[in-house]
Amino acid sequence: MQKLTILGATGSIGASTLKVVEQNPELFSIVALAASTNVEKMVALCRKWQPKYAVMADKAAALALQSELASVSPSTEVLGGVDALCHVSALEEVDSVMAAIVGAAGLLPTMAAVKAGKRVLLANKEALVMSGQLFIDAVEEHGAELLPVDSEHNAIFQCLPQQVQTSLGRCNLEEHGISSILLTGSGGPFRYTDIAELEKVTPAQAIAHPNWSMGPKISVDSATMMNKGLEYIEAKWLFNAAREQLKVIIHPQSVIHSMVQYRDGSVLAQMGEPDMATPIALTMSYPSRVDAGVKPLDVTQVGELTFLQPDFARYPCLKLAIDACYEGQHATTALNAANEVAVDAFLNNRLGFTDIARINESVLNKITASHKSENVNSLESLIELDRMSRTIALEFLRERS
């Protein structure tokens, strides 16, 4: 029986994780559920799952949850704040931690799980984007097991030999005959929209993803392809890939979730229904496979598969992320912070869709002019740079309004 902490239990990844647990009750049990602010959803989850711990990142939300749970799940201990998130990520009785808190907020609890030597099911891409080498070094130092949940990284993982799967972050692709990794992305809902029309895009249009069901932040990132940019940075760290070994391909149907090209001319691809329960189930049961409750892909119904080069004029955020990836850790940390601020402003109708890239670029330029990667060599310095980048992004926002 594998015991789980789920960080981000009220989100879409949390829901898919619980779907896999429900499908395999003899294999998995829930120790702790954690979320940010959604008390109503957390009450429903605690009523159903009766976890030992329920944690809210927001302390006021934790107090509200505590009074709600007194009658429906009295044995559940309610905790609040970032320290509490870190505590349930490092509990001795926990085997695996699903790290699915969106954004920079997920970094500290994910790192706590790593330092406790847990099996870390990594759905929070920002942890690697923000802390890269520090994160990879901590995984090795503390004997944690890192398994990628993101559908693309999970697809790549499945197409790699076992020696690479068990040495993520420090593997040598060339040694194993791998020539390149092809990271696929749908191109989002605006891949055929006239570029001149993009500045009129509304939040409602941007969060309507054609293939995947995701939260609002990730849906907007998919529309700008910043999501693919962050995944590119994550792939660079997970698979220790050089720039020439990592390519982004637009694949509108989202049937192939990514591919690996080998030296002998072979290309291995992972296919499946666009359902996050599949990669989640693999990380939970690796190296075995369990029933994820996902209908099998009917390949006769797929029709044609299309592959295109990304157009950086349409997706400037993707280009910013790829360039930041090889500029250094200071650049990716700053870009991630700026993007979180810009997307939040867009979702709240305070910023235009095409201005997201402009804010991101302005912050990136300002930080790279004053910082180098060697300036960010500790978790504390990364968190300070993240804070500084957000402040600069907010200043640029005020100037625009």
UniProtKB/Swiss-Prot annotation:
<feature type="binding site">
    <location>
        <position position="227"/>
    </location>
    <ligand>
        <name>1-deoxy-D-xylulose 5-phosphate</name>
    </ligand>
</feature>
<dbReference type="InterPro" id="IPR036169">
    <property type="entry name" value="DXPR_C_sf"/>
</dbReference>
<feature type="binding site">
    <location>
        <position position="150"/>
    </location>
    <ligand>
        <name>Mn(2+)</name>
    </ligand>
</feature>
<dbReference type="GO" id="GO:0030604">
    <property type="term" value="F:1-deoxy-D-xylulose-5-phosphate reductoisomerase activity"/>
</dbReference>
<dbReference type="InterPro" id="IPR013644">
    <property type="entry name" value="DXP_reductoisomerase_C"/>
</dbReference>
<feature type="binding site">
    <location>
        <position position="231"/>
    </location>
    <ligand>
        <name>1-deoxy-D-xylulose 5-phosphate</name>
    </ligand>
</feature>
<feature type="binding site">
    <location>
        <position position="124"/>
    </location>
    <ligand>
        <name>NADPH</name>
    </ligand>
</feature>
<feature type="binding site">
    <location>
        <position position="152"/>
    </location>
    <ligand>
        <name>Mn(2+)</name>
    </ligand>
</feature>
<keyword id="KW-0414">Isoprene biosynthesis</keyword>
<feature type="binding site">
    <location>
        <position position="125"/>
    </location>
    <ligand>
        <name>1-deoxy-D-xylulose 5-phosphate</name>
    </ligand>
</feature>
<feature type="binding site">
    <location>
        <position position="209"/>
    </location>
    <ligand>
        <name>1-deoxy-D-xylulose 5-phosphate</name>
    </ligand>
</feature>
<keyword id="KW-0521">NADP</keyword>
<dbReference type="InterPro" id="IPR036291">
    <property type="entry name" value="NAD(P)-bd_dom_sf"/>
</dbReference>
<dbReference type="Pfam" id="PF02670">
    <property type="entry name" value="DXP_reductoisom"/>
</dbReference>
<feature type="binding site">
    <location>
        <position position="10"/>
    </location>
    <ligand>
        <name>NADPH</name>
    </ligand>
</feature>
<feature type="binding site">
    <location>
        <position position="12"/>
    </location>
    <ligand>
        <name>NADPH</name>
    </ligand>
</feature>
<keyword id="KW-0464">Manganese</keyword>
<feature type="binding site">
    <location>
        <position position="231"/>
    </location>
    <ligand>
        <name>Mn(2+)</name>
    </ligand>
</feature>
<keyword id="KW-0479">Metal-binding</keyword>
<feature type="binding site">
    <location>
        <position position="152"/>
    </location>
    <ligand>
        <name>1-deoxy-D-xylulose 5-phosphate</name>
    </ligand>
</feature>
<dbReference type="Pfam" id="PF13288">
    <property type="entry name" value="DXPR_C"/>
</dbReference>
<dbReference type="InterPro" id="IPR026877">
    <property type="entry name" value="DXPR_C"/>
</dbReference>
<feature type="binding site">
    <location>
        <position position="215"/>
    </location>
    <ligand>
        <name>NADPH</name>
    </ligand>
</feature>
<feature type="binding site">
    <location>
        <position position="222"/>
    </location>
    <ligand>
        <name>1-deoxy-D-xylulose 5-phosphate</name>
    </ligand>
</feature>
<dbReference type="GO" id="GO:0030145">
    <property type="term" value="F:manganese ion binding"/>
</dbReference>
<dbReference type="InterPro" id="IPR013512">
    <property type="entry name" value="DXP_reductoisomerase_N"/>
</dbReference>
<dbReference type="Pfam" id="PF08436">
    <property type="entry name" value="DXP_redisom_C"/>
</dbReference>
<comment type="similarity">
    <text>Belongs to the DXR family.</text>
</comment>
<feature type="binding site">
    <location>
        <position position="38"/>
    </location>
    <ligand>
        <name>NADPH</name>
    </ligand>
</feature>
<dbReference type="GO" id="GO:0051484">
    <property type="term" value="P:isopentenyl diphosphate biosynthetic process, methylerythritol 4-phosphate pathway involved in terpenoid biosynthetic process"/>
</dbReference>
<dbReference type="InterPro" id="IPR003821">
    <property type="entry name" value="DXP_reductoisomerase"/>
</dbReference>
<dbReference type="GO" id="GO:0070402">
    <property type="term" value="F:NADPH binding"/>
</dbReference>
<feature type="binding site">
    <location>
        <position position="228"/>
    </location>
    <ligand>
        <name>1-deoxy-D-xylulose 5-phosphate</name>
    </ligand>
</feature>
<keyword id="KW-0560">Oxidoreductase</keyword>
<protein>
    <recommendedName>
        <fullName>1-deoxy-D-xylulose 5-phosphate reductoisomerase</fullName>
        <ecNumber>1.1.1.267</ecNumber>
    </recommendedName>
</protein>
<feature type="binding site">
    <location>
        <position position="11"/>
    </location>
    <ligand>
        <name>NADPH</name>
    </ligand>
</feature>
<feature type="binding site">
    <location>
        <position position="186"/>
    </location>
    <ligand>
        <name>1-deoxy-D-xylulose 5-phosphate</name>
    </ligand>
</feature>
<feature type="binding site">
    <location>
        <position position="13"/>
    </location>
    <ligand>
        <name>NADPH</name>
    </ligand>
</feature>
<comment type="function">
    <text>Catalyzes the NADPH-dependent rearrangement and reduction of 1-deoxy-D-xylulose-5-phosphate (DXP) to 2-C-methyl-D-erythritol 4-phosphate (MEP).</text>
</comment>
<feature type="binding site">
    <location>
        <position position="151"/>
    </location>
    <ligand>
        <name>1-deoxy-D-xylulose 5-phosphate</name>
    </ligand>
</feature>
<feature type="binding site">
    <location>
        <position position="126"/>
    </location>
    <ligand>
        <name>NADPH</name>
    </ligand>
</feature>
<comment type="pathway">
    <text>Isoprenoid biosynthesis; isopentenyl diphosphate biosynthesis via DXP pathway; isopentenyl diphosphate from 1-deoxy-D-xylulose 5-phosphate: step 1/6.</text>
</comment>
